[in-house]
């Protein structure tokens, strides 16, 4: 028996909290590697890889009616690259990366790699036992894009030491890292994830990323991660149409495709898909000691008509625009995370006025611990870019945020969203000559520090 009955039951129920411990590739103590993958509509699944020069694959065996396929490859070993050859009902076979891979080839290569159990010896016990997400806990977050922050630093360990010195010297309490999960284009924010369980290989292996988090923790710096459960790319070798059908996504493009980003939207109504995402959140916290997740694009998950034409979406069962499955998923996610990691932070990037984002689930909320205050960022920067001569007509841009400042547990972001697409740096947004720009920037920072919110 390759997979235990309890694992199969919990997976199909959508409640397995340790998916990575039985799905994917696992090195066996007696030799070889066991592979397991979910592809319920496939007619055959083979695993191919380095062990035989990517020749004839090993056929996996269907595991009862669970939709899972599993098998052992005696010649496979740690570090080997592999893919699944998934044959659809139409007879077409496509090479797919492992959705549960815990290590990947460095892009632009796209194969998964066999990862061994971690050998990292954690030294952050003091941090892990003392961290807190309680109201009033200090929270000053420094957002970092690993690929562009110090481009000459090419690995997790080198980045860790210099980043720890910089952040500690600036008085920040946390870093928010982007991008961490594997993605195809290194020049991006990493929001088109192709390896949800795989730290990007651009900066080293999984244990190297563990070392990054460990070093920051030992310096008293928390680590948050940008996390993307809203959508995924259409690359054929990844999650898209994984077994020849819409498996992780909706079949109807009005529900399953995002028109702005050209990506697929997760099918939150499917137990296995929700399980894949919830377990992924737990994976980063357990295996990598991540202190919290900044959940990207929550607004796009909550509304069925988000960025869609009037005839380009499907109403819910009550005729409304709310995505009931996504709401249930977010509540399940935050409930499970709070149960497993009570001191973890869950931060929502939610750009509308959806009520009770940071209220407890039992009181009708979504259960996040924090919400990015996108409205405050827009209004404040709009005010600051106005010439001081004219600001007396625009004080409402500053005061309006105070009307709702205590309706949620807000984080005040000055983030990547405001520098992309030619928007320029914060300094470049300020009016006047260089002296005036720096003075205005100091005023902006002082206002941010004084405003209620983290």
Residue ranges and their predicted role:
Residues 1-34, 63-143, 148-154, 158:
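The feature marks proteins involved in alpha-glucan
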Residues 126-141, 145-322:
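Substrate-binding/active-site clefts of carbohydrate-active enzymes
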Residues 41-42, 146-149, 182, 229-230, ...:
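Short, solvent-exposed loop/turn segments at secondary-structure junctions
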Residues 38-45, 52-54, 408:
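Short proline/glycine-enriched turn/loop motifs at strand-loop junctions of beta-rich domains
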Residues 108, 289-291, 306-454:
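Conserved alpha/beta catalytic core and glycan-binding cleft of carbohydrate-active enzymes
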Residues 53-59, 92-94:
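Surface-exposed loop/edge segments in extracytoplasmic proteins
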Residues 45-47, 82:
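Short beta-strand elements bearing conserved aromatic residues within extracellular beta-rich modules
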Residues 56-67, 379:
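Short, acidic Ser/Thr/Gly-rich low-complexity loop/linker segments typical of extracellular
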């Amino acid at each position: 028996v390759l997979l235990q009955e309890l694992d199969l039951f919990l997976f199909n129920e959508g409640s397995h909290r340790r998916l990575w411990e039985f799905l994917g590739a696992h090195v066996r103590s007696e030799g070889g590697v066991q592979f397991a993958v979910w592809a319920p509509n496939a007619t055959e699944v083979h695993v191919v890889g380095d062990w035989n020069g990517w020749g004839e694959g090993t056929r996996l065996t269907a595991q009862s009616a669970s939709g899972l396929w599993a098998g052992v490859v005696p010649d496979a070993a740690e570090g080997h690259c592999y893919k699944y050859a998934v044959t659809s009902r139409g007879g077409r076979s496509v090479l797919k990366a492992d959705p549960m891979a815990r290590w990947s080839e460095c892009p632009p290569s796209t194969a998964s790699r066999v990862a061994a159990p971690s050998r990292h010896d954690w030294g952050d016990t003091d941090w892990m036992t003392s961290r807190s997400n309680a109201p009033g806990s200090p929270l000053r977050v420094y957002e970092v894009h690993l690929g562009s922050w110090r481009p000459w630093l090419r690995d997790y360990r080198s980045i860790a030491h210099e980043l720890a010195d910089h952040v500690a010297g600036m008085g920040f309490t946390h870093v928010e890292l982007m991008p961490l999960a594997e993605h195809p284009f290194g020049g991006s924010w990493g929001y088109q994830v192709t390896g949800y369980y795989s730290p990007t290989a651009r900066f080293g292996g999984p244990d190297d990323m563990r070392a990054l988090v460990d070093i920051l923790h030992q310096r008293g710096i928390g680590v948050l991660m940008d996390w993307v459960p809203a959508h995924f790319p259409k690359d054929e070798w990844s999650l898209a149409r994984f077994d020849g059908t819409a498996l992780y996504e909706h079949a109807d493009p009005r529900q399953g495709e995002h028109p702005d980003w050209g990506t697929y939207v997760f099918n939150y109504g499917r137990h296995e898909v929700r399980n894949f995402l919830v377990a992924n959140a737990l994976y980063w916290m357990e295996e990598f000691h991540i202190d919290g997740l900044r959940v990207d694009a929550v607004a796009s998950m909550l509304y069925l008509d988000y960025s869609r034409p009037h005839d380009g979406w499907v109403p819910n069962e009550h005729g409304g625009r709310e995505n009931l499955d996504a709401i249930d998923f977010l509540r399940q996610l935050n409930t499970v995370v709070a149960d497993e990691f009570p001191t973890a932070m869950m931060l929502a990037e939610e750009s509308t006025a959806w009520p009770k984002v940071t209220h407890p689930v039992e009181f009708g909320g979504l259960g996040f611990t924090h919400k990015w205050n996108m409205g405050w960022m827009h209004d404040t920067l709009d005010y600051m870019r106005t010439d001081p001569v004219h600001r007396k007509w625009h004080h409402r841009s500053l005061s309006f945020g105070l009307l709702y400042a205590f309706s949620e547990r807000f984080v005040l972001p000055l983030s990547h969203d405001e520098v992309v697409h030619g928007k320029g740096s914060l300094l470049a947004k300020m009016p006047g000559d260089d002296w005036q720009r720096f003075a205005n920037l100091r005023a902006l920072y002082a206002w941010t520090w004084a405003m209620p919110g983290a």
